[in-house]
Amino acid sequence: MTDFGDFVRRRRERLRATDKTFSVRQLARRVDVQPSYLSKVERGEVAPPSEVTIVRIAKELDVDADVLLALAGKVSSDLQAVIRRRPELFGELIRQLRGMPDRAVLRLVREVRDGDW
């Protein structure tokens, strides 16, 4: 089982405990894949789906798409475009952030977002 598939299965089952529309069959229909394929994804028998399908699954499961993409070993296409424009800077930025506590990273993100830099 993959981290991606396991996460999707656990999240879907948690939601299904209170909402029966989260069966494999019904979720598969809403994200436009075959139920057998989604079942195989959950069991880790096939590779995670495309970015488009992962984003649909994330929306249905009320999970941040970047979290599911990361679990699938993928990076969203919008982030890929940003990284390709400045690969050295982003590589170094990520390496520097690696050792920082989450609270410090969040503070830095807020400062950049709010223009306080």
State what each model feature region is:
Residues 1-20, 107:
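A short, Lys/Arg-rich alpha-helix, primarily the initiator
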Residues 12, 42, 53, 61, ...:
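DNA major-groove recognition helix of helix-turn-helix
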Residues 17-18, 45-50, 76-78:
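Short, solvent-exposed alpha-helical "recognition" segments
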Residues 32, 51-67:
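DNA major-groove recognition helix of helix-turn-helix/homeodomain DNA-binding modules
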Residues 73-117:
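Interfacial/linker helices and their anchor residues that mediate assembly or domain coupling
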Residues 35, 51, 68-81:
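Amphipathic alpha-helical "recognition" segments
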Residues 17-40, 70:
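Short alpha-helical DNA-recognition segment
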